[in-house]
Amino acid sequence: MPKRQDIQKILVIGSGPIVIGQAAEFDYAGTQACQALKEEGYEVVLVNSNPATIMTDPTVADRVYIEPLQAEFVARIIRKERPDALLATLGGQTGLNLAVELDRLGVLAEYGVELLGTKLTAIEEAEDRDLFRKLMFKLGHGVPESEIVHTVEEAEQFCAKIGLPIIIRPAYTLGGTGGGIAETMDEFIRIVEGGLKASPATQVLLEKSIAGMKEVEFEVMRDATNQAIIVCAMENFDPVGVHTGDSIVFAPTQTLSDRDYQMMRNVSLDIIRVLGIEGGCNIQFALDPVSFTYYVIEVNPRVSRSSALASKATGYPIAKLAAKIAVGYALSELKNPITETSFASFEPALDYVVAKIPRWPFDKFESADRTLGTQMKATGEVMAMGRTMEEALLKAVRSLEIGQADLHMNRFAEMNEADLHRHIIKATDERLFALYAGIERGHTVEQLHEWTSIDRLFLEKLHHIHRIEQDIVKHGLTPERLRHAKRYGFSDQMLARITQQTETAIRQIRNESGLHPVYKMVDTCAAEFASDTPYYYGTYEVENEAVPTTRPSILVLGSGPIRIGQGVEFDYATVHSIQAIREAGYEAIIVNNNPETVSTDFSISDRLYFEPLTTEDVLEVIRNEQPIGVIVQFGGQTAINLAESLEAEGVKILGTSLEDLDRAEDRKQFEAALTQLDIPQPPGKTAVTVTEATAAASELGYPVLVRPSYVLGGRAMEIVYGEQELEHYMKHAVIASPERPVLVDRYLTGMELEVDAICDGTDVVIPGIMEHIERAGIHSGDSIGVYPPQRVPQAIKELIVDYTTRIAKAFRIKGLLNIQFVFADGELYVLEVNPRASRTVPFISKVTGLPVARLATNVILGDTLASYGLTSGVLPEEKLVSVKVPVFSFAKLKEVDPSLGPEMKSTGEVIGTDRTLEKALYKGLIASGMAIPEHGRVLLTVADQDKQEMLDLAKRFTALGFTLLATAGTASVLEEHGLRVQVVGKLGSEQGSMLEWIEKAEVEYVINTMSRDSQVTKDGFIIRRAAAENNVVCLTSLDTAEALLRVIESLSFEASAIQPFDYMKKAVAR
């Protein structure tokens, strides 16, 4: 079937901000889809709310709207643009839910907009739990015994009938939001209540637990002619019961018999055909390992996280081909872009093993419940490829950047047997390491299988790694054993641990024996067809397929897995850098290990190496490619942290020199440089011991801001109010050393400001100054950022330009730098300087129209800013106001405190742009998922130091018609100032406690600020968690509350009584 000629303009819906369950994979899918549609000559209009993505670049679509993904806003775009068709299946769950809502509201019918690809009936049959179950029965496919319920009472009746454990799956949610496995009645009621609240349809599926069965996923494609293929079959290391996004996954499947595989393949093809899905689809199965019984767990009728993994694992570009199928093409008409000779109707074949390991945020949230279940908790993932399962797994482990070079974790090695047993049987982010510790202690594969239900083959592979390790311990590292260990993925660092040598010593042994990896091509066809797509992975074999070209090349280091503090913003900068390198005539090489991102799309760079971002792995790529230099500025802290070890091995770092990177990162050198420049900075000191830290704090005066050096995202950063707190921080939160001391600064409260700047050694260009709504003390990544600044005097703007220019030149910056300031007590202070791309680069690029990362790359390559018509200073301010609003995933992470502070907690961001600050804020807050009721109840529970400031906010809420709720202490303060308050009970009150109000969602807003009193702090945590779990807006900063008030005031009409006539009084007076 040829492409459709009856449509010209297509609206593509993106997936919005990065949240747990919906990450960068949709930036990759959406970008591919837009490019595919433009290739075919269609006019493409894109709507998405996320400024941090390549997808929202102006070049990706013909017109890009960065607007809230709400029916109200998308309907406006449809009215304005009048598209012929809508493509929603590349926008994740957000895109699907929005398409369903637009259809329900009649918007699509009113404007004659056709839904491309998968039809609404198929979406509803796959997403609606009841319809899906009925379809599976009709087709004769197994589904677990289950029932759809809409109330807790219905749920209790089903539980009484089949008994516990029960799996709870809410309908139309993302990443298992609101779901879980209930082992007890209390758990069951709690999860059902949460699931009903989380589901837009107030519908949950209760099913008899099949936890412990083998979990398998099939990625399937179908076109309108009913051709269908399996792109990739993947097998989870963890049995059913752990969300697939939280599971270690292998591709191709490793433990299935051919009969099992063919059975589920046929079922997958049957399901996609009956549903009539046109494009990509993900089907999840539970398989009984001892019989041929299977159950269909769920069908995702869209491109998903697994699609991105399958695309990168096989090289088959699912999203691109799904977009082409949506406009009428058949699989047999589409060429496979990797081979360019075979067609997309050929099923991919793999001659290597792929391992995916999730990246969890528990290093940021140590209080979080680390148990893994049906509700996803990972923020990102890594992927690795090898010729053996062991190699792929070990490469993936060292890609995680969690301080683990291999499977041996000291904490588990030193643990007592009972505690280790608990860590083995319980699914957590660390169970893989606990299993290895069990093997080190002599537990058999059979024992571990009995305890965990993990397939024996997977456990045998862990056992094999341990046997290789023990062989080296007993017999030494001979050349044969070295080669054997390398073939199974042992890194130099791992071998250094085993042999008690240094990593450098192992590298030297390897270099002397000429032992290096070769690079194999990912070609979708196991070398059946000729392919020259430069997409490689390293392995220890004989033939090297990555033959370097003669053109001069530059290597860019990616930023690794998505995590809090280092998100998709860094991938955005990396992609722009690669594009600039290619445009400058160099060959662009990238090393990265994240399957979700645009940077690991093989069509972006000239050569893609899917490898761990470690010194060893990067050096081997450099040895093979011999680039003229390496760029580390765009890969976040991951890349910056590799600069020193690479330069020590003779690698040329392009851009800002290592010496100058160190001067900015090293506290003493940084302070000395600012003192020499006569630029104010908060008084501060460094400390290596508890004594040094307490002495520094006493001298500076409490409160102090403490943090480790060389970190990103405010990792382990805290505001400390007393000596006891500081001692606890030094003993538990950080490991200080002379090379990496703890920084102790006086804590300044004031307005925080931020700039990104580009320096070529002569000129310093600042695209724009960003102002933070929240005062200093809340991490910049968690603050609402405003451009252009609204409250900053002209004299301070000029001072920011002056300080930035002088710092950039003094630190000999070549490329990008980011500076954070605080304006406190009439003085402008420099808080920190980052000599690299920051997370605000995509935002400032989009709101100013200056491609910051691309321009910085051109400067690194030798261009001057003057050659682009740019001179030193800040660009003229834009007329529209833009706000960057952080997005959090607190509902997914139980036990995490939703209060904001100096350690970053947001997973993503959205943008709001309009003519006034209030309108921009409204769009930004709505886009972030916040509901903004214009009347109702506000619960005020604030710390004593905030009560005076709270009064003004309380008066303004009252003027808008809100009812104020407060506990007795806060209520008395409000009543003293003439405000009417409804008194509510404290936590633990027998009736009418504030917790009841929140749990029943009978308040619209909770304003809660942190107290230093330990009991009050504990109560505050319970209040904030209750708000997060019941979808009640909770604000922990009065600055954010004031911004919200401005928005509500701008939406509200004044309701004033008319004035009495006074001319009669005047006449009488005369």
Swiss-Prot record:
This enzyme's EC code(s): 6.3.4.16, 6.3.5.5
Entry binding sites for Mn(2+) 2: E298, N300
Domain MGS-like: 930-1070
Residues binding ATP 2, per UniProt: R707, R746, L748, E752, G777, I778, H779, S780, Q820, E832
Catalyses which reaction(s): hydrogencarbonate + L-glutamine + 2 ATP + H2O = carbamoyl phosphate + L-glutamate + 2 ADP + phosphate + 2 H(+)
Cofactor note: Binds 4 Mg(2+) or Mn(2+) ions per subunit.
Protein name as it appears in the record: Carbamoyl phosphate synthase large chain
Domain note: The large subunit is composed of 2 ATP-grasp domains that are involved in binding the 2 ATP molecules needed for carbamoyl phosphate synthesis. The N-terminal ATP-grasp domain (referred to as the carboxyphosphate synthetic component) catalyzes the ATP-dependent phosphorylation of hydrogencarbonate to carboxyphosphate and the subsequent nucleophilic attack by ammonia to form a carbamate intermediate.
Region span, Oligomerization domain: 402-546
Domain ATP-grasp: 133-327, 671-861
NCBIfam families according to UniProt: CPSaseII_lrg, PRK05294.1, PRK12815.1
Assigned keywords, A-Z: Amino-acid biosynthesis, Arginine biosynthesis, ATP-binding, Ligase, Magnesium, Manganese, Metal-binding, Nucleotide-binding, Pyrimidine biosynthesis, Repeat
Binding-site residues for Mg(2+) 1, renumbered to this chain: Q284, E298
Pathway field: Amino-acid biosynthesis; L-arginine biosynthesis; carbamoyl phosphate from bicarbonate: step 1/1; Pyrimidine metabolism; UMP biosynthesis via de novo pathway; (S)-dihydroorotate from bicarbonate: step 1/3
UniProt: Mg(2+) 2 binding residues: E298, N300
Residue stretches in coiled coil: none
Cofactor names: Mg(2+); Mn(2+)
Family recorded in the similarity comment: Belongs to the CarB family.
